[in-house]
């Protein structure tokens, strides 16, 4: 499978992506990680208004192969939860970078997106040598 690695995203070691939009952060899971999971059957996410610390679990993704936790790369308050991926996990599977985003957070403080991998670094990490 050929994966997309948009230049406007940053990636955590745990395969979450971050997209900055007007000072807020949209969080999701990379195409690579979603593909590795296989058919997704269930998504559970924290509630809107939840305050989370960096590295804290904000949900789980269950597939026919495994149950994986997803982690927040930066501390912040959850402003929005993508209810459509909870109601229809296929959205996450089919369009993880577009309509399959998971959360929008207001970061606790100024975040250093450069702490995360850029698209080229992430592509190198997940691509076979």
Swiss-Prot record:
One of its GO terms (biological process) is glycine decarboxylation via glycine cleavage system. The modification N6-lipoyllysine is found at residue 65. GO terms for cellular component: cytosol; glycine cleavage complex. Its cofactor is (R)-lipoate. The keyword Cell membrane does not apply. The glycine cleavage system catalyzes the degradation of glycine. The H protein shuttles the methylamine group of glycine from the P protein to the T protein. This is Glycine cleavage system H protein. It comes from Prochlorococcus marinus (strain MIT 9515).
């Amino acid at each position: 499978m050929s994966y997309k690695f948009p230049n406007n995203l940053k990636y955590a070691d745990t395969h979450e992506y971050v997209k900055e939009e007007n000072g807020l952060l949209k969080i999701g899971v990379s195409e690579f990680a979603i593909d590795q999971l296989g058919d997704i059957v269930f998504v559970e996410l924290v509630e809107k208004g939840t305050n989370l610390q960096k590295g804290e679990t904000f949900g789980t993704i269950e597939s026919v192969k495994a149950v994986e936790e997803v982690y927040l790369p930066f501390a912040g308050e959850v402003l929005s939860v993508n209810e459509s991926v909870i109601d229809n996990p296929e959205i996450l599977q089919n369009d993880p970078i577009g309509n399959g985003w998971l959360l929008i957070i207001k970061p606790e403080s100024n975040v250093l997106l450069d702490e995360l991998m850029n698209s080229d670094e992430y592509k190198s990490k997940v691509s076979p040598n």
